[in-house]
């Protein structure tokens, strides 16, 4: 795999097989452990079928090694805000700029859609904190979920 892997966009012209492959990736044990949540196929289907949402993925020899789901419209977002809902890279592929390339692709889509801010919810104790900071995101607010998980809302102007 090259250092500058270009993310593939899964949109209405993609296939159901693409969505299923991304679903399987997000639900791999190593990925779920980092995300600390289960990804529902119906959520990915909405990202596949709605014009304000996108799935991006990177593959190596036909294997999905990284993926991102984002959306530009939601009742929980400000009018000018897009959000990266999920982003993950297989552990053995981290440190190669793949996550950064996925986030840049999401930011580009959000700008094309007319958004000026990108956000991401991140667990406060996550190893991904440094990743988000390296991309220019800053903590906008901190809170605790109903089940006691400490979270940070990272955001940046795009």
Short names for language-model regions:
Residues 1-4, 46:
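Short, conserved catalytic or adaptor-binding loops enriched in Gly and charged residues
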Residues 101-117:
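Conserved acyl-CoA
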Residues 119-123, 133, 138-153:
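Conserved catalytic-core motifs of GNAT/GCN5-like acyltransferases
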Residues 87-94, 122-123:
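A short, internal acetyl-CoA/4′-phosphopantetheine-binding micro-motif in the GNAT/acyltransferase core
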Residues 128:
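Helix-turn-helix
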Residues 96, 100:
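Residues forming the Rossmann-fold NAD(P)(H) cofactor-binding site
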Residues 8-85, 90, 103, 109:
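Acetyl-CoA-dependent GNAT
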């Amino acid at each position: 795999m090259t250092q500058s892997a270009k993310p593939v966009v899964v949109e209405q012209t993609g296939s159901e097989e693409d969505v299923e492959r991304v679903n399987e990736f997000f639900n791999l044990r190593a990925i779920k452990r980092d995300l600390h949540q289960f990804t529902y196929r119906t959520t990915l289907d909405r990202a596949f079928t709605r014009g304000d949402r996108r799935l991006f993925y990177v593959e190596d020899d036909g294997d999905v090694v990284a993926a991102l789901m984002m959306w530009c419209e939601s009742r929980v977002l400000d009018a000018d805000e897009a959000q990266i809902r999920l982003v993950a890279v297989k552990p053995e592929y981290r440190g190669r700029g793949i996550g950064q390339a996925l986030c840049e692709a999401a930011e580009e889509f959000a700008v094309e859609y007319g958004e000026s801010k990108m956000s991401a919810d991140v667990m406060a104790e996550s190893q991904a904190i440094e990743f988000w900071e390296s991309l220019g995101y800053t903590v906008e607010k901190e809170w605790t979920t109903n089940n006691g998980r400490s979270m940070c809302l990272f955001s940046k102007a795009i």
